[in-house]
């Protein structure tokens, strides 16, 4: 596993990585566990990701995943995807179209500003090179958000503390 994230209600643990099975069942690079029982949760079906998941962020009934994948559930998604809870399971939100030119390593969802902060090895975010290595897209549509940073090097980890964002 590359990344672990708890749901906002602390009842579910989301796990991303490069695995293809969990307990003998197909789970392509992303799975959820019920924290109380330790069992695989039916919340996340096998999404058929073609590359690893290295970042997960939760916001309300939505999950955002990032990594090295270019396909989710048979649809082209360049290293970023949004999953929305519907009918007791998370499903791919096909209308959310954010994309990064290279691997995404970390995500921070900021519901107050409506932005998803994205960090990684990419040189462009949603086609804009000024967002290299660290940028933001909107939680709602995945379009480039009005936020910019120019770290000049790859950002592998980000953390928010109050109104400040720290990057390493």
Task: List PLM regions with ranges.
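Extracytoplasmic surface signature
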Residues: 1-168
């Amino acid at each position: 596993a590359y990344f672990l994230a708890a749901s906002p209600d602390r009842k579910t643990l989301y796990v991303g990585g490069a695995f293809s099975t969990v307990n003998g069942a197909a789970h392509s690079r992303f799975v959820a566990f019920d924290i109380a029982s330790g069992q695989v949760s039916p919340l996340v079906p096998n999404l058929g990701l073609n590359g690893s998941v290295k970042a997960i962020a939760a916001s309300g009934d939505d999950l955002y995943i990032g990594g090295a994948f270019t396909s989710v559930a048979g649809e082209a998604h360049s290293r970023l995807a949004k999953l929305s809870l519907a009918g007791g399971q998370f499903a791919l939100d096909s209308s959310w179209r954010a994309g990064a030119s290279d691997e995404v390593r970390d995500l921070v969802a900021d519901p107050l500003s409506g932005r998803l902060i994205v960090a990684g090895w990419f040189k462009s975010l949603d086609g804009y090179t000024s967002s290299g290595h660290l940028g933001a897209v909107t939680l709602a549509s995945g379009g480039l958000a009005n936020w910019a940073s120019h770290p000049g090097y790859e950002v592998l980890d980000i953390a928010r503390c109050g109104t400040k964002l720290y990057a390493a």
